[in-house]
């Protein structure tokens, strides 16, 4: 066998082997993920049809207008029919791709109804970890998540340090978590099982390890799990602050109580720097050989008092928004939810206002640039 054939066989085998892998986005376990799979396959098939048509036309024209065929000159200066066709076809292609895509995007942002009894979970990113706070159940987990099957879960995405992206491929698409704001993202698991979630936005050394397990169980098993979680150690502020320190050696933890009792990350984006100071953690060159070198100077116990709830987000102060502090003995009631919704509405207005301001600046700049012509 020639060297070329050997290489061809080798690369062909590699291509076939790739089909043996479990592509998570093509193995959906929720309605949003199923919708995403449909869009992916629809787009691929649509593009393959277009490519096949182009290759067929290319072959036909290559043969028809070959040098040896003296009956066809191949010269054409104008043809209204053909020009209309190759204008209309791309428009049809764009419309055919846009309609299901736009429809899906609107479905993704649709909020669940009260009768659906959605479960609310605050998903907070910090220190290459994910903190999941259950405000109604008064429990918190680190790097693992348990949800009931067939029940919508409203994730309230927040970040306490770098911008990250919350993604559970088998349940749906990703959405960014950023400091100083809260982003809603609703997902539902239609099957029981364990799925993998991750941060899909590169944010440093621990990016590849910022993952979490998602356990989808029946409602009765979820209630049993909540009862067991409430028996765990209470999450106090000292423990939470130490967990905020960046580390690539993360563990799955469960606590009773939540960090919502003493900090609202959206209202107090500077909180994490105070936590660093309490444990003498200093940001250094991240490329250490071992985790011990990275955290060599970190204290076992804090040398400063716990920080009281504060508002350091200028937008909160400017728009009269309140910090969402929910004590471990306080109910996640309608009053709290109303204030929560109010803050979300205000953040949307701020976002829209920023877009309008940016657009007006661009328009003004274009006007000034065009004024001299």
UniProtKB/Swiss-Prot annotation:
GO terms for cellular component: plasma membrane. GO terms for biological process: ATP synthesis coupled electron transport. Residues 1-19 form the signal peptide. Its EC number is 1.10.3.-. GO terms for molecular function: copper ion binding; cytochrome bo3 ubiquinol oxidase activity; cytochrome-c oxidase activity; oxidoreductase activity, acting on diphenols and related substances as donors, oxygen as acceptor. A lipid is attached at residue 20 (S-diacylglycerol cysteine). It catalyses: 2 a quinol + O2 = 2 a quinone + 2 H2O. Disulfide bonds: none annotated. It is found in: Cell membrane. Residues 292-373 are annotated as: Disordered. Residues 292-320, 339-373 have a biased composition (Basic and acidic residues). The chain crosses the membrane at residues 38-58, 82-102. InterPro entries: CcO_II, CcO_II-like_C, Cupredoxin, CuRO_UO_II, Cyt_c_oxidase_su2_TM_dom, Cyt_c_oxidase_su2_TM_sf, QoxA. It holds the Pfam family COX2. Catalyzes quinol oxidation with the concomitant reduction of oxygen to water. Subunit II transfers the electrons from a quinol to the binuclear center of the catalytic subunit I. NCBIfam families: QOXA. This is Probable quinol oxidase subunit 2. The gene is qoxA.
């Amino acid at each position: 066998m020639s060297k070329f054939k050997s290489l061809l066989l080798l690369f062909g085998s590699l291509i076939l082997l790739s089909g043996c892998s479990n592509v998570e986005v093509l193995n959906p376990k929720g309605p949003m993920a199923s919708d995403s799979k449909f869009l992916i396959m629809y787009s691929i098939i649509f593009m393959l049809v277009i490519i096949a048509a182009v290759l067929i036309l290319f072959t036909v024209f290559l043969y028809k207008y070959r040098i040896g065929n003296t009956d066809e000159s191949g010269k054409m200066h104008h043809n209204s029919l053909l020009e209309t066709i190759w204008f209309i076809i791309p428009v049809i292609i764009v419309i055919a791709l846009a309609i299901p895509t736009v429809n899906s995007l609107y479905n993704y942002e649709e909020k669940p109804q009260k009768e659906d009894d959605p479960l609310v979970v605050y998903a907070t990113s910090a220190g290459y970890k994910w903190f999941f706070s259950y405000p109604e159940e008064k429990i918190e987990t680190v790097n693992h998540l348990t949800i009931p099957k067939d029940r919508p879960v409203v994730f309230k995405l927040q970040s306490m340090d770098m911008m990250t992206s919350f993604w559970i491929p088998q349940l749906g698409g990703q959405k960014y978590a950023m400091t100083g704001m809260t982003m809603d993202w609703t997902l539902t698991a239609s099957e029981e099982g364990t799925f993998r979630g991750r941060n899909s936005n590169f944010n440093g050394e621990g990016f590849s390890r910022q993952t979490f397990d998602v356990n989808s169980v029946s409602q009765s098993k979820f209630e049993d799990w909540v009862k067991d979680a409430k028996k765990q150690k209470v999450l106090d502020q000292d423990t939470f602050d130490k967990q905020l320190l960046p580390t690539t050696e993360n563990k799955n933890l469960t606590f009773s109580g939540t960090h919502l009792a003493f900090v609202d990350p959206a209202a107090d984006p500077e909180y994490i720097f105070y936590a660093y100071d309490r444990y003498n953690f200093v940001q250094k060159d991240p490329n250490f050989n071992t985790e011990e070198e990275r955290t060599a100077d970190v204290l076992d116990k804090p040398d400063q008092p716990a920080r009281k709830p504060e508002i350091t987000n200028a937008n909160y102060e400017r728009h009269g928004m309140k910090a969402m502090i929910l004590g471990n003995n306080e109910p996640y009631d309608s009053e709290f939810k109303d204030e929560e919704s109010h803050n979300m509405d205000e953040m949307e207005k701020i976002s829209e206002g920023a877009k309008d301001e940016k657009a007006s600046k661009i328009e003004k700049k274009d006007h000034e640039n065009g004024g001299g012509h």
